[in-house]
């Protein structure tokens, strides 16, 4: 089990807030007070530090959809490809393999947490989520 950092907490909240606490796959609404029913799902798992805090790598999914896409990786890939489009999907795959980017994220995890804490206010004002790296 990976340790949940402040950066993870604020990044996850930003992803769910940007989705208006609605599952991006099935449309189920999970109000903020029930936000534990909505996960921040990573296409490339959280262990892949190079894209752990990358908005293109994260989707707000209800628990049911999160379990489903985890059990059906081909459908998960198709869902993410449709969401991002071919160019952004390929760019995400390339960033996922960038080891220097992963090392940077590990070194700067506290700064990443501060960044997403600030981003949360912008997202709540309707602005798009901006990544850190």
Model segments located where?
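Short, charged surface segments at domain edges that flank catalytic/cofactor-binding sites
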Residues: 1-22, 102-106
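Histidine-centered nuclease catalytic patch
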Residues: 24-59
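Short Cys/His-centered divalent metal-binding micro-motifs
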Residues: 28-31, 58-84
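Short microdomains enriched in Cys/His and/or Lys/Arg
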Residues: 44-57, 81-96
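Short flanking/linker segments adjacent to small metal-binding domains or redox-active Cys/His motifs
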Residues: 90-133
